Each structure stands twice: as C-alpha cells, then as structure tokens.
Amino acid sequence: MASSAPSSSSCTFQAESSFGPAVASCRRAFDFTLYFEEVVFVLVPSCVFILLAATRLLFILRRARRFTTATAATTTSTDTSSSHSCGNAAQNQHTPIGHGLAHHHILQQCTAGLLVTLHVAGLILLCTTVPSRQRTDLSVPASVVAALAFGVVPVLAHFEHKRRRPSSGPRSSSLLVGLFLCVAVLLRAPLVRTHAALYGSGSALVAVEIASLVLQLVLIAVGEVSSWAADATSNFSPEESAGFLGRSFGSWLWGTFVTGYRTTLSLDSLVPIDSSLESRIVATSFDHILPVSPSGKPGKNGQYRLLLALFRSLGLYALAPVIPRLCLAGFTLAQPFLASATINYIGNGPAPDRDGYGLIGATFLIYTGIAVSTGWYWSLSYKNVTKIRGGLVDGVSQKMLRLSQQHGTESKVLTMMINDVYRITSTLAYAHELWVAPIETAIGTWMLCRHVGPPGLVVLGIIGVCLGASTYVGKHMAIQQGVWLAAVERRIGATKKMLASIKAIKMMGAGPSVAEALERLRRLEFAASRKFRALIVGTLLSSYSTATLAPVLVFGTYIGATTAAADFSASTLFTSLIWISLLASPLIQLLQIIPSFGAALGSLERIDAFFEKQEFTDERDEATAVDSSCSEKGEKKKEHVSLSIHNSSFSYTDDSEDSILKDVNLVINRGQHVVVTGPAGCGKSLLLQAILGEVAPQNSGSRVCVDGKVAFCSQTPWLENLSARQVVSRFSRDKDPSWTDRVVDACELREFLEAQDPDATIGSQGSALARAIQSRPDILLLDDVLSPIDYVTKKRILRQLFGKSGILHETGTTVFQVTQDHAVAQLADIVLRLDETGALRPYQFPPSQADVEDENGDVDNGAENTRPRESSHTTEAQSGPPEPKSKPTEITDRKVYATYFESIGFLNLVLFIGGGIIFAFCLKFPNVWVGWWTADSSDPDEASHNIGYWFGIYAMLNVLPLIAVAGWVAQLMMLIVPLSGSKLHRKLVDTVSKATFSFISRVDTGSLLNRFNQDLMFVDSRLPLDLFNTAAALLTGIAQVILIGVSAVYVLASIPVLAAVLFLLQHFYLRTSKQLRHLDLQSKAELHTRLSESYQGLATIRAARWQRQVHAEFQAGLDRSQAPVYLLWTVQTWLKLVLNLVVAGLALVVMGAAVGLHQHGSSSGASASASGIGIAFLNLTTLGETMTNLLTAWTSLETTLGAIARMVSFSRDTPAERDVLVRPDSLDHGGGGGGDRAEPPESWPESGGIKLEGVWATYDDDDESDENTDDSGGRPATDVAADGEKHEATTITTTSSTMTTTRYALQDISLEVRPGERVAVCGRTGSGKSTLLLALLGLVAVRRGRISIDGRDVAGVPRARLRGAVHVIPQDPFISVASGNGETIREALDPAGKLGDEEVTDVLQDCGVLDKIVGAGGLAASVSDEALSLSAGERQLFVLARLICRAGGRCRHGGGGILLLDEATSSLDVNTDGKTAEVLRKWLPNMTVLSVLHRLEAALKYDRVVVLEGGRVAHVVTPSESTVSSDIFAFFGRSRSFLESRETGGVSWLE
C-alpha cells in the first residue's frame, strides 16, 4: 500500500486505508472505506464465529461423553412408566437418523467444502492478481481469517450431526452456523460491491466472490430444509431441526398452523416440542430448588432463595435472551434518528436521490430488525419460563409425595400449581425488561437532552416517582395476594368436599344449602381481594403517568428555562416526542410488571414455604436400620417377626398432649392373620397409620418395626380415574398372567372386568384390594375393606384369600386388618380389640356372633347352589354408561362474549366501552394538537397564537387521559370483576348441583374442580387485565392508524390492504390458537386430577413404595401439559413477529411515498409536510408495539375466554334434572287421587307410607324420553335364558331411526312399606339396593311403573321438594363444606333452632359423639373437619345426630316421615350398630325406615327384610314367621339354628 500522503490526496486509494467509515464522495458515493469493511464486515464476525464455534465444539464433545455414560446406566434400569406413555412421550424415544438426513448431511458437507475451496481460491487471487498498492494492510489477513471461519463450518456441522444428544432431534446444521452464514451474506455483499468498483466487475476475484455468495445462499437453503429431510424421524421436534431462518421467521410452526386450520388438534397430535423441555431433563436441572434438609423455617436466602435457585437452574440459558433484547433495544432507539433524518430530508428542500433510497433501506433494516429480534427475544424468554413452569410443577408434585396428609394441603397444592405457577411464569417472561429498561432510559434521556437540553432530565424525575409508587404497590400487592389466595384455598377446599360428596348431597337434598355456602365463601373471597384489585388500579394509573405527564413537564421546563426564543420546529418537537414516547411506552409495561413481580415474589414465597415444610419421616426405617430384625433385643428368635410395636403411644397430631393409643405392644410373626376391632373413634385406623409410619410415636423409647414389602388398602378405596383393569395391574411388575388371573378370581372381579367397557373409568373396592395383592406384598394392611360387600361375595373372597387354600396363606403374607365383621375375624389367627381408653387387648367375638360355618362354607355353598350368580352388568356403583366419547359442544365466540357480557350487565358494558373511547381519544388527540402547534409556529411572524396558548391546552389534554383511565379501570376492577365472577361461579355451582346423578357421578372430579380453580382464576385475575389491555390497545391502535392516514394521506390507500392482511392473519391464526388454549386448559385439568388422586392415595403409595412410579407418570402428564403451553406461547411469538413485519411494510409505504413525493412532488404539485411526517412517525414508532400488545392481549383474552367457553360448554353438555319428572296434569294414576296435581303440603309426608308398583329404573340420563313397549302390557322385554336365569338386565328398543340399549338396575319392583314400618333391604353387591333408594329420591330414571308416598305419585313432586321431605343418611357421611366460614356445630346440627342445648346434648350423648364434640370446643366450636377430627364411624354417628336434631322434634310429637339409610352404619362395630337402632326408636319412634344393610344382626331388628337379586325382589320376609325360607339366612351365612338360638335365649330380637 502507498505510504502516507497529504490530505489533498483523499481521492486516491489512500482514502480506502482509513477507518472512515464513509469513503470520500469523490471516490464512491454512499459507500464505506475498504479498511472499514474488512474490519467490521469480515474480521469481527469471522473471529467471533471461530471463538463461539470452538466453545460449541468443546461443549458437544463433553456432552457426548456424559451422554454415553448416562446411556450405559440407563440401559440397565427399567422404565417404570412405559405403560403410561402419552402425548409427547414419543419425543423421548431415541429414533435413529433416517437415510434422508444422511443424504442431506452429505450434501451439506459437500457444499461447505466447495465454499471453503472458493474462499481459498479468492485468497490466492487476491494475493496474485491485485497489486499491493490496491490492498490495505488487512486485506490478506481478513481473507485468511474468513477462509478459516468457513473452514470451521463443515467441522461444526459434522459434530452437530454426529455428536448430538439422540433425543435432541435431527440438527443437520447448527443455529450458530446458520447465523454466521446469514450475517456473512449480508456483510460480504457490500465488500464484493467495493471490490467490483476497485478491481472491475469482470475480474476473476470478483467472479469468485460472487460465486462464493451464491454458494453461501445455497448452503443456507440446505440448512433450512433439514427438517424436510427428517420426515422419517417425525418423533423429533421440528423446532430443533429447523435452521436459523426457520427459527427466526417461525416456519417450523407451519405444520401446526395448517393442521389446526384444517382439522381438530388433540394432545396426541401436537408436534413434539424441544427436547430440553422434557420433564425428566428439567427435573434434573431444577432438582436443587427443593431444600436439601427442610426444617420448616425460611431458607438462608430468605424470600429470594427460590428465585435465585430458579435462575441458577437455568444456567447460561437464562442469559440467552440478552443478545436479541440488546438488538431490539438498538433497533428501537434507531427510530428517532430515522424520524429526524426523514423530517429534515422533507423539510430542507431538494436532496440527492441516494439519500432517499438510503432512508428507505434504513427503514427496512430497522423495522425488519425489530421484528426478527422481537421474535428471538420472546421465543427464548418463553422457553425459559416453560422450563421454570416444568421445574416448579414437578417440584410441587415431588414435595407433595414427601409430606404427611394434613388438612388443607391438597387445596394448597392445587392452588400453587395453577394460580401461583401461572403468576410466576407470566411475570418472569418479562424478567429481562428489568435490566434493559434502565439502559434504554439512560440512552433515551441523553438523546432527549441533546434536543431540549437539561429540561430533558425532568423525565427522570417522573420515572423515579412512578417507579417508587410501583415498588410500593408491589410490596403491598404480595401481601394482599396472599390474603386473597388464602380465601381461594378455602373455597377450593370446600368445593372439593362438595364434589367428593355429590351423591350424598343430592340424596339429602342439601344442594341449595351447599350452593349457598359456596356462594358465601365466594363473597368472602371477593372481599379478601378488594385491596388487591385496588392496588391494580393504582398500578395502571401510575404506568400511564409517564406517557402523559412527561411531555408536559419537559416542554414546560424547556419553555421556562430557555432565555431566547424556544425552538418549536417540527424536527425538535416530534423528535423529542418520539424519544419521550420510546421512553414511556416500555415504561407503561414495566410499571405494570413491577407490581406483578411483587405478586410473583409472593407466590414464590408461598411455594418456597411449602418446599420448606417438614417432610414425612418414616420412623420405622430408623428402627430397622438399628436392627434388621423386628424382634426385641436379647429375645430368642424362634420365628421371623414381620411387624412389631413396643411401648408406643400415638395421636393424630404431634402437638396433642393426650395420646389416643397408649403403650401399644404388638408382635406379629410372618404369615399370621391379625384382626383388630373396636368401637368407633377408638383409634383403629390410627393404629394402621402408625404401622405405615404415617404417624410417629409420641413417647421416647418406642419402637415400630416393619420387615418386608407392605401394601395398604384404605377404608375409602384409592381409585384413580382409570378402568378396573388398569387399577389392578398398573403398579405390578409381575409379568406372570396366571398370578393376575388368580388375584382377579380371588377378589371376585372376573365378571366385573369382563362386563366393563374397556374405556370405562369405574373402579371398585375389589379393584383396590386386587391391586394391593397383585404387588405380592410381605405384609398386607387392610382398613375395613370388605364392609360394603354382601355376605355371599364376601365369603367367597375370604375363603379364596385368607382360607387355608387362599393365595395369601400360600404366599405366607402377613395380614393385619381392621374390621367389625365377625366373618373376617373367624379366619384370623389373632383377634385384638381396641377399647375407648386406647388399650389393645386380645378379644373373642361372642358365640352368637361367631356362629359361622367353617371356611368350606356349607351355607355359603348352599346359597351359591340355590341362587345363581348374577351378572355384574348392573352394579351397585353403576354410574351409567361410560363417559361419552363425543367432543364437547362447540361454542362460538359470539356465545362466549355474550355470556361474559351478560354476566357484567348491559349498563356496565356501555360504560366500559364509552370509557375506553374517551381514554383513547384523550391519549392520542394531543398528537394532533402538536401538529397544529408546529404548523402555526413554523413562521413566528405569522403565528396566530402564542406559546402559552398552545402549551396550556396541550398540558390540559395530557392530564385528561389519567382521569379517564382511572375511572375506566376502577369500574372494571371494582365493579365488573366481582359481579361477573359471582354470576359465573353461581352458574357453575348450579350446573353441578342440578346435573343428573348418572352424569355427574361419572365425570372426573379433577376436571370439575379445575373449572372452579383454574377457570375462575382466569375470570377473576387474568380476564379483566386482558380485557383492559385489549380494549386499550385496540382503541389506541385505531387512533394511531387514523392519525397516520390523516397525516400522510397517501397512506390511506394501503389501509384496505392492511385491514385485509390483518383479517386473514387473525382468521388463520385464531383457528390454531383457540384449539391450543383449549388443549392447555384440558392438559392442566389432567394434571389437576393426577395431583388430586396422588394426594388422596399418599398412604397407599408410600406404603408400597410407589412414589417413583407415580412421579414418573406425573412427569408424563406434565410433558402432555407442557406441549400446548409452549406451543401457545410460540404461536403468540410468531404473531408478534408477523405483526412487526406488517408494521415494517407500513413504514416502508410511508417512507417510500414520502421520498417519492419529495423527489417528484414539485412537478405534480403534491408534497409531504414535515408536521405530517412527524405525526406519522410519532405513531409509527409505537404502532408496532401497540399492535403487538393488541394481539398479545387479544390472544390472552381468547385464552381466558376459553375458560368461559368451557363453562358454557359444560353447562350445555350437562343434562339437568327436570324440576318435575312429568307434568302434573299429564299424570295417569290409573284411578289415583287427584291430589297429585297440586303442590304437596308443607307437612307432607305426614304418615310415611311408600308404595312401588312395577318400577323399572335405569341410570340412563334420558329419563324423560318416551320408549316403545312390547306387547306384554308395556313392560320392557327381558332376556331369559333357557335355564330361566336372567343374564342381563337389558332391553333393546328399536325405532325407525335408532336402536338403543337400556340397562335396568331395577326390574319390575313392587313393594309396599306401611307408615311407621321399618324395612331392611339386603342383597348381593350390584343387586339394586342403593338404586332402590335413589329411585325413591328421583335420582335415577324410572321408565315404567309408579312410586308413591302417602298416596302421592312422586313423579309430580318437584325433586327439591321430594328430597327435602325425605330424611336420608348416605353411606358416605357428609357434614359440611363450609369449614372456616363461621358455622358452629350447634348451627350444623339444628339450623332452625328447634331444640334446646340440653336436647342437642342428649342426642349427641345417645349417639356416642358428645365427648368428641366437647373435646373440639363444645357446640359453639367450628364445624370444620380439622376441628372435629372424626373417624369414619364417628362421622356416621354425627350425621345420625344431625338427622335426629333436624327431624326429631316433629317425630317425637306424633309426626311421621320417611328415613332412608344407605349403609349408614357400615363403619360401626356390631354393638354400636345395635345402639343406633335403639337411638332411632327413642328419638324417631314414628318414622318409616327403609335401610340398606348387610348385617343379619341389624336386619333382625327390622319389621321386614326385603332381599333383592338382579334388580328384582327375591324375598320379602318377617323374622317372626316360622315359615321363613332358609335362603334368607343362607344369604347372611347363618344357619336356621341361629334364629333358634336367638329365640331360646329369651331375647326378643324384634326389640
């Protein structure tokens, strides 16, 4: 290169050797120097790429070694959740790379190699054909570094292809390679242009460089089509196989969009998402968010421990959004410079055409850069928060499995999983705005000061005040959010109780009172959230303060501080306003985020406090660790001890001073069968909990030891939402089908399994028992699991399980069970009894109760021979046909919006819309005023008004938006939110409470609870803000487009095109986004169900050590949930990208038209004004953000409205009970009295007579449908086999268009119960006993026949009136849902206050629960479960006492009535059960009683015994008849001598 020359030679080649950056115009117009291009366009990107590529290669090699080690370890383990793979589990499979990818990789390597060859050739040509005087000092070094950089490309691509993690998908080209190639093409093109100008366009060097550019484009295209070559490996994520451009412009989402547009998406049809989001990978990264040693105290890092742990878990991925966010900040801050240059270009007269073309090019680069960098920023941010969501939800599930079962834990877990995790993730998505906002503020303020001087610093004061206010609000918001969520937890807990007890509630007619209790809790919830909502109003008000007040204060200070005439030219005013707008627009969002961060920190504190909870500790493990034997030290080991308890006392709570079980000593040898009995509330279940380790001993020196694998079956069976087949075998690792068959047969499940629909989700107690035995335990713990089963079935199960030839005896299983059943006790090796003092003593049942045949079961066999085994097609727990496979009703957007607007009221809707219009007008009209101001001030000599006039009105106009937004948001948050939330909650409660019993009993409880939890959370917290943001952005955007069109008239021509593009975009986008949001809600409902089910079965899961498998299955469900969550976020990111590209197109139209008019306007007479361009750019700078905010808020609004759509769909799809079964005027009584047509009197039923005439009942929902009948008198035809056995209670009715199959649970039942009579209803499981009670209450469909009470057909009585008139004690006792809302025990027992305190106390004393009530605090104590702590038997006694208190006054004074008992004393011992009959006779002497039971001793106390079989009446006998068939006694397993012994014993069993 030539040596130094004087400055006069700037037009020689020496000018190319300077850094420039611009070269002298005498050499080339509008170009950079060669030296600058070699440094910035070649050396810098090449060196950065080489450095990053080396780092990436090192990472790949290290990861490959780790993966090889992990794979070797994994292949030796067993996949515990293979049978439960779902959703995106396919992405976990290591599918080999197909031939298409192999060929693609070869093509890529060949192309890259050829590209390297061309760069080497170019280097040689540069050195040989270009003289040194025409090269800079960096020409050759830059070419060498560039050749090295391109030489790294095939190496990196090869290792990305060969050394990647197999589950990460087919990456034939890395993002780093794609990014480098794209940048290289953009930067090398100007250098090739410069070389062509310097060395000639026909030179060999330029030809090689052009070929190199073309080959780079080819290589980019090859990398982008890698996903097409991966069709054979469709299990991989298309995102991971996409190239850089595909990721930048979201082309990998096209498959999802097309599928969603053409068909219906499902969780199984979604494309696999990024493998880094798999739960197993996320759980590994986030494993340290759980404290290592929970102590129940806050961690050492305080409230930020969990937040820091989350970011530490993300590692370097937490910093991934930094680079695109900095790029976005740079492009955004370039807009004022572009606007200023454009205004000056328009206002300064003629200019070279190249300046206009440069402005057009700059517009393209700036706005396209904003679009692409925005897409990358949000894509990486959403990926991080998706990982955080997975880590938190997984952590909550893990922690739940480690905690003891305590009241309120379940509702707390469900609230955290939905509400808290949502708040955290939706807030942390904006985490990077916190650090970038100060940078943008500093730069923006500095640039503002360059235009207006020191007055520009005023904006910092406004920002400081607003930030201080937001920080203050954020701190208080976390506190108020905790108060609100505590109220939510109380409501969710009460709702869970309601849903779990829906059968009992409907039977008791307690629906209205329960609904009112839930409504009361809902009102308390809104009262608790009032301050939180007020803080939101303050937050939104402060967020808009910067945008409205900053221009006023800045310009006011500028006017006051300027001594000379202030410069109010269009360039100064609009450039300043653009800077203020760029400062204020992100601050509006930031100031809303800061309080949200306060709320998110509150949620993090709640979850962290949950993580810090003291975990369940198994004291048995410590004992076993000391001594592997369960024998006492020093004791001679004659037999192997399986279970032992030494000197231990137990209570349900650690802080209880009095022990329920005292000084328990127990030693059980292997293979023994031990039975424990005792009165209700004595602590039998507590003893089982102690053996399981769920309850720790209270005294020192105690020892609990369990030696062997344990299985536990609780009194309330733990049944998941699975079929009976899946329940039995889901935890079994035993692949021996013969063992499964033996277990199924022993538990009498064969016929049930064969008859059940494979897809039905109906389990049974027998399924839970079979699951426990299927796991081959060494010790089997049973908590009264056989009490609901009829005696005949029970005898078979006992013989096949516990008899000498039973499978448990064969396997040597130690059995420890709690029961009140003497039939079970007779097969036990040891019988123990717990008394009221908590002492455990040996026990022997009285002879009258132990008079049972031997295990060969003579009477049982007789019963089995005389009575064929009924088909199990109709079961006692029949809940109708399987849940419908059809999709929910499609709800249109119009219906959804109509439902929501109806909930807020017409007046509120009009006020809300009006407030939004006023706000948008007040917010944007000041821009128009500034345009008039600048136009008037352009010539000071001709100004019509002074500055004070213009500025004063401008100041007033900028204050009006604050007033408007304050009233607008206050109306929304303080009036609309509680009003709509209350109405929608009531709609949900009414839908559930009024649903038909057959429908609501088969709907998944978790799905229902999710509607009361997540859906209402959306309605309360997310929907109002989304509605506000959508309305504000929509109205503001309309105002901005109008201002752009008015200010630049030529832009109006593009408005129709813009509208068409937006319409097509939303039409195409919304079809997919709507489905994704529904799948998001659906998958969260599944997680809801999984967590709820797992919590209910914690004791069972921990007993059998199933935690790992349950957690693995939960992770599979979490993967299903992560897919729609992440895809919904990614399609929203794609929408932001496209909208910013639309804004880029609009900006190009504005700029192109302005440049064109400026260049050619003088000849045509048209021109663009500086003030018009200023207004246009002032709105263009924020239009992209406004449109992004609009579509983001709109899509979020669509998501939240999806919750309302689910409510509407649920309401439509849920069949509701008719108030009256048939119209009273259409009743055909066949001679019945006409009194049925009138409303029954308040005293009805007065006597309590019941009559059933030819009743056919079914669980089918269509109870009002007419049905064709046969020729046999209108009764449905019944299949009868040749031997006379009714194999199926089924009738098939054929019409001209359809064929329906109806399964009848009751068939031709005719029975009359006289007033005051007490009738026992007995029968095998599935015989129709409970169905008979349900038919009396109108809970099942009576298709034929008539049921009357006191001569009145119940078909004409409103159902609520019917259930309110009949007293019911259900099998599952229901006390109250409204725990914690102030209801006392006195109010729960006698809400009407009919009895005095002494009478209530007497009732409690007679029912045997007075001591428990006194211990809870007396009649004035809360009725909550945690306060009462009643056992299952005590709950039944409490319900009995409540019934007596509510009905006793009337019955004791001569009134009658009807009492239905559905296994109401199944959890009581025989003695207590006998006392309940005496209590009923004492307090309800005139009551007609119809009782479903299984015990003969109880049945013999009734006036008559009705035996049902196969839905028909088999026997109706009175115990006093000497001609009673022995069949009735055979049913109970008693011989005829039993009756004789009772009679000869001088005992009047009728008493």
Curated annotation (Swiss-Prot):
Occurrences of domain ABC transporter (ranges): 645-861, 1287-1535
The keyword Repressor is annotated on this UniProt entry: no
Position of the signal peptide: none
Pfam families: ABC_membrane, ABC_tran
Binding-site residues, ATP: 678-685, 1323-1330
Alphabetized Gene3D superfamilies for the sequence: ABC transporter type 1, transmembrane domain, P-loop containing nucleotide triphosphate hydrolases
Coiled coil: none
Keywords of this entry: ATP-binding, Glycoprotein, Membrane, Nucleotide-binding, Repeat, Transmembrane, Transmembrane helix, Transport, Virulence
Domain ABC transmembrane type-1: 326-599, 910-1199
Top-rank taxon, per record: Eukaryota
Acidic residues bias (residue ranges): 1259-1270
GO MF, one annotated term: ATP hydrolysis activity
Region called Disordered, residue ranges: 843-889, 1219-1296
Bilayer-crossing regions: 34-54, 110-130, 139-159, 172-192, 202-222, 314-334, 358-378, 428-448, 452-472, 535-555, 577-597, 903-923, 959-979, 1027-1044, 1137-1157
Compositional bias per record (Basic and acidic residues), positions renumbered to this chain: 1219-1228
Record's bilayer topology term: Multi-pass membrane protein
GO cellular component: membrane
Alphabetical list of SMART domains matching this protein: AAA (SM00382)
First-listed, main subcellular location of the protein, grouped into a coarse class: membrane
Record's subcellular location: Membrane
Sites carrying sugar chains: N384, N647, N721, N1179, N1486
Presence of the UniProt keyword tRNA-binding in the record: no
Protein function: ABC-type transporter; part of the gene cluster that mediates the biosynthesis of the phomopsins, a group of hexapeptide mycotoxins which infects lupins and causes lupinosis disease in livestock.
Family (UniProt): Belongs to the ABC transporter superfamily. ABCC family. Conjugate transporter (TC 3.A.1.208) subfamily.
Protein name stated in the entry: ABC-type transporter phomO
Organism: Diaporthe leptostromiformis
